[in-house]
Amino acid sequence: MTKLESLLHASTGLSLISGYLMYNRRYLLSFDKKREGETTQSISVIIPARNEEKRLPKLLKSLSQQSMRVECIVMDDDSNDRTAEIAREMGAKVYNVTYDNNGNTWIGKSYACYLGASYTVSDILIFMDADVELNNEHALEAIIQSYARQQYRGLMSIQPYHVVYKPYEHLSAMFNLMTVVGTNSFSTLSKSKGESLAFGPVTVMNKSDYILTQGHKNAASHIIEGFSLGKAFQRCQLPVTRFEGQGFVSFRMYEAGFKTMIEGWTKHLAVGASSTQPHIMMLIILWMVGCITSFSGLALSLFMKTLSFKRMALSYSLYTLQFIRLHRRVGRFSILFLAINSILFLVFILVYINSYRHIHYTKQVKWKGRQFSIK
C-alpha cells in the first residue's frame, strides 16, 4: 500500500469517525397510548401562510384527522391566490396580516406568527409552516406528550421529516442534515452551556412563556426565527428542546421548483452555520472531507496502478453507507442520489458560498417575491 493510498484511507476513516460523533444522539417524538387524552390544556395551531393554496390543504386535512381537537388559525400574509378562501372552507379561522404605513420594516413569517398569537387565548401555542403535514392521527398527541415531559414550559421545536418527489428535491439532502446537526444538540460532544437554537417549521410553547419572552418579536430583524426564539427563551431561563419529526411530522420543501429551493437555502444557510459550535463545525468539515477523499480515491484507482481499486471501492462504500444512513434519518431521499454524494456535496458548497456572499456582503436575500435586509 502506497503512502497516497494510506493517506486517502486514513482521511476517509477520520471522516467516518467524525460522521458518527456529529450525529450519535437522537431525540424522537413518541406516542404513549396509555397517556392519550391526558392533557387538559387548550391548544391553538397558528399557520403563517403566503400564497399557500397548494400546500395548505394537506396540513389542514391532517389536523382535522387528529385524535385531539385544536383551534386552527391561518394568518394570510398578503396572498394573491386562494389561500384564505381554502382555509375558511376547511374550517380554519383566517386573519389578514396587516402592515401599518409608518415605515414598518418587520414583515414576513415572524410578524405573521406574532399577530396570530394575539388572536388566541389557548394555553398552548403551536406554530406550523404551511408545508408541514402530520403523518398519522396521533401525531399531535405525540407532540403534546413530548411537551408535557418538560412540564408544558419553555420552547419545543421539531424538524419535520423531509419527503421528496421530484429529482431536484433530492439536492436538499445535505442541507437538511446540516440543519439538524448544526443545532448542536445531536452529538454527545455538544456543550450544554452553548446557545439554545431551535428549528423553525414547528414550534411549541405555552402562552404565558410566549408573552414573557415576547415570542417572535425577537425575530423582527432576523432571518431565522427559530434561532431568535431559542435564544429568547434561554435568556429567560426556560427549557429549549429539539426533536426530529420522523414518523409523526413531515414536510415537502420547495416543490415550486429548483430556483425556489436555491433561494430558500440561500436565505439562511450561512447564518445557521455561524451559530454552530466550533468543535461541532470541525466534525462537520472533517466528515465532508470524506466526500472528496473517498470519491477521489475511487476515481484515481481507475488510472493509477499504485492504488488498489478494491480497497478504494471498499473505502468509498463504507463512507457512502454512512452517508445514506445519516440522511435517511432526516428525509426520504433516494439511495441512488445519496450514492453519488460528491454531486450533493458540490451543490451544498456552491449554495453555501452564495449564501455567505448575500449575508455578509450584499446584506440582501430574496424570498417569495420579497427582498429581506439582513442586519
From Swiss-Prot:
Top EC group: transferase
Record InterPro entries: Glyco_trans_2-like, Nucleotide-diphossugar_trans
Membrane topology: Multi-pass membrane protein
MF term (GO), any: glycosyltransferase activity
Main location class: membrane
Keywords (A to Z) from UniProt: Carotenoid biosynthesis, Cell membrane, Glycosyltransferase, Membrane, Transferase, Transmembrane, Transmembrane helix
Recorded metabolic or biological pathway in which this protein acts: Carotenoid biosynthesis; staphyloxanthin biosynthesis; staphyloxanthin from farnesyl diphosphate: step 4/5
Entries under Pfam families matching the protein: Glycos_transf_2 (PF00535)
Location relative to the cell: Cell membrane
SUPFAM superfamilies linked to this entry: Nucleotide-diphospho-sugar transferases (SSF53448)
Residues annotated as transmembrane: 7-23, 112-132, 280-300, 333-353
Listed GO biological process terms: carotenoid biosynthetic process
Protein EC: 2.4.1.-
Any one cellular-component term (Gene Ontology): plasma membrane
Keyword presence, Transmembrane helix: yes
Membership in a protein family: Belongs to the glycosyltransferase 2 family. CrtQ subfamily.
Purpose: Catalyzes the glycosylation of 4,4'-diaponeurosporenoate, i.e. the esterification of glucose at the C1'' position with the carboxyl group of 4,4'-diaponeurosporenic acid, to form glycosyl-4,4'-diaponeurosporenoate. This is a step in the biosynthesis of staphyloxanthin, an orange pigment present in most staphylococci strains.
Name of protein: 4,4'-diaponeurosporenoate glycosyltransferase
Upper classification of the organism: Bacteria, Bacillati, Bacillota, Bacilli, Bacillales
Record gene name: crtQ
